[in-house]
Amino acid sequence: DALIGVSMTGIASGVVLGLNMRKASDVVKRENTRVAKLIGINKAARCTTVKPAGTTSLVLGTSSGIHAWHNKYYIRRLRVGKNEAIYSYLKSNHPELLEDDYFRPHDTAVISIPQSAPKGSIIRTEKVMDMLERVKLIASEWVKPGHRAGSNSHNVSATVSVKSDEWKQAG
C-alpha cells in the first residue's frame, strides 16, 4: 500500500482557512496518481494530513500545523549542536541569536528567534471550541477528501489545551 501524507502548516496564520481545501485535496490525489503511474507504483490510499511542523514553520514564518501562534510576539528557542552548520553560520553572521546552553555549554547552543504573528492570525488565547472546530473543519475539508481507500484515514495531529473553565463545553 503506497502512502503519502501531503500536510499543511500555518493554518492559524489566517490564509489557509480561506482556501478551497477540497479542491486542493483533489489536486493532491491527481498529482499522486500521475507520479505513481510515472514511477510505476500504486497510488496512495491516503494522501492528505496535518501534522505539527516546527522547523518548517520557522523557515516559512507560519504557525505550526493546525496550532495557534503562541502569542502576538514571543521568542522561540531551539537547541543545536555546536558542530552543526547552522551554529557556525549564525556564530559568524548573527551571534546575537546564540547563547550557550545552560546544561551543556561545551557542545550545545540555544538559538533565540524573535517571532511575530501576522495580522489576523489566531493566537493561543482562543477558546478550546474554536480550536476543536478548526480541527473538525480541516479534517472534513482536507484530510477526509484526500482519503481514497481503506478503513484508516490520516488525521489532524493536534495538541488541545483545555482551560479549567472549558471542560464542560469541550465534553
Regions inferred by a protein language model and the residue ranges of each:
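Catalytic alpha/beta core of large soluble enzyme barrels
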Residues: 1, 52, 59-171
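Internal maturation/activation junctions in enzymes
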Residues: 3, 8-52
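Short capping micro-motif at the N-terminus of alpha-helices
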Residues: 45, 58-59
